[in-house]
C-alpha cells in the first residue's frame, strides 16, 4: 500500500488496517514455519506497510502535540 493512499485514511481506519495487517503477518509467519508459504515476499510487504502506517500515525500525533503546544 502506498503512503499517499495511507495518508488519505482516517486514524480509525489506520488502526483497523494495522490490526488486520498484524494478524496477516502472524498467519504468514505461521505458514513460513510450516513450509506452506507460497510467496515469501508478502512478509516483507506486510512488514513495510505496518511500518508506514505506524510512521503516519506518529506524524499525526506529533502534529497534534505541536498544535496543542502552540495554542497555549
Curated annotation (Swiss-Prot):
Q: Name one GO biological process term.
A: translation
Give a yes or no for keyword Ribonucleoprotein in this entry. yes
Source species, domain of life: Bacteria
Disulphide connectivity of cysteines: none
Q: Name the Gene Ontology molecular function terms of this record.
A: structural constituent of ribosome
Q: Which UniProt keywords apply?
A: Ribonucleoprotein, Ribosomal protein
| Xref: InterPro entries | Ribosomal_protein_uL29, Ribosomal_uL29, Ribosomal_uL29_CS, Ribosomal_uL29_sf
PROSITE patterns in the cross-refs = RIBOSOMAL_L29
What's any one GO cellular component for it?
cytosolic large ribosomal subunit
Q: Which family does it belong to?
A: Belongs to the universal ribosomal protein uL29 family.
The entry's protein name is Large ribosomal subunit protein uL29
